[in-house]
């Protein structure tokens, strides 16, 4: 058995017991770092210590020089097989072992081992010392040869547990390192995962923020769109309200205009009624006066019938010229004086009546104006509810074709009774009023005709008169058509020279025909005749529906439209229709804004005649009576009369102008 002491340093001490069953041999080996022999002793048998001490120097001197050749083959092979692995282990252990662990091993090896020596000494006997010495000699050589190998083996055996421990430690350290590395890797992985999670969370937060921003932007856009839509709806509502307000205002204006027109018409009707009443009164008075005059004239005519010659009848082909023939009478001066007195009385009575009528008219007009103002205030206070009805704009308006048929004025002849044989007409007798068919002009209307019992009226209608033309007159008319006369001012052509002369009076302003009652002048005699009917109260044109009478045929035509409902005059702007052209002209001023009536005192302009009259009466203290031809003293007498007279003369002219 080998006893292995704990190694302390590179110098190793080994003890080896070799012997047979009968003998024991103790061999101490010591290996130093420098290769010198150690103080170990070989004990075998009962030899003394001195022999051992003597042999030791020899062994020491001889042992290093001898090679280890005589070693057994088995031990050398084992040593050689174990050397490479042991060397590698030693090198690894030496590299891995720290220096503080090597120093105590070296110290343990250098310590003496007295315990082993004390155990070997009791076993030595005297008989065995020689054999032991021989064996020792033999074995010393072998021991010297095996000494380094044994040392190596001993070292290897000593180092194996340490190596195992160190390997275990290393393994543990490696495992710890691996565990640490694994933990670190896990920590790193966790950190990376955390970082990834943090990054993902940040990305998610960013995406959420972006989504929130997009949602906010979308909400803002939606809000803006809603606000814009609300604004558009509000604008549309405002526009609709404005349109409704404008339509309401327009309708209110139209209603006001219609009301004003109705009020004006009412005023005009009331004024016309008043005028008619006044005219009726005047006519009654005039009839009474005429009856008195007729009685006087009949008496005078009865006295003079015997003195007058029979009247001469004109030929058909010759034109009749009526002239006044002077008559000499003895009582002419007396008759003239009586006439003058009667005329003065009549004028005074007329003036008084006219003043009274003017006062009455002014009072009635003031009352009517007050009533109108009250009605307007009431209408303004009342709420006007308007109902809008859809109108088809694409509907075609019906075309109204008007066929104007000229109304032929009838010629009325008042035959003046004349004396039987004297040939002189009675002064003061009513003059004959002649109204010719269209195209004919009465040059002179005064003619001495035979006396009759009562004044007769001879009516010559237009178509019958024109159809009953003589061949000579028809020839003259044809020649006039072939040679028409043309006006040098406006270029208008006429078939007769008399028509041209009458037309030229409109350019020159001549008014040769004057009224004997009021002194008003006219350019045409027919206009004077129609004007004189105002004074005489004559109304030859009767309505076939209501038996109402009129002094002019145009007035009869206009009146008959109230029964038939005909409204031939249509407004081109709004389509409203009227039965009278003057109403259409007055209505069109609301569209055009025309103000034709100018105040001569202040220059203010007005749209309607009623407005300027009210203005003059309220501000300037002036007034005029309608239909009587009375004007202010500062204005000329023929300011408004000619236009009306000319309109009355040409019945179809206003209709043509309106169309």
Curated annotation (Swiss-Prot):
SMART domains, per the entry: ZnF_C2H2
Single Gene Ontology MF annotation: zinc ion binding
InterPro entries: Zinc_finger, Znf_C2H2_sf, Znf_C2H2_type
Any Pfam family: zf-C2H2
GO aspect biological process, one term: regulation of transcription by RNA polymerase II
Keywords tagged on the record: Metal-binding, Repeat, Zinc, Zinc-finger
Low complexity composition bias: residue spans: 87-134
Annotated zinc fingers (C2H2-type), start-end: 485-507, 513-535, 541-563, 569-591, 597-620
PROSITE patterns, sorted: ZINC_FINGER_C2H2_1, ZINC_FINGER_C2H2_2
Region Disordered: start-end pairs: 29-144, 638-659
Amino acid composition bias (Basic and acidic residues), ranges on this chain: 135-144
PANTHER family: PR DOMAIN ZINC FINGER PROTEIN, ZINC FINGER PROTEIN 22
Name of the protein this chain belongs to: Zinc finger protein 853
Organism in which the protein naturally occurs: Homo sapiens (Human)
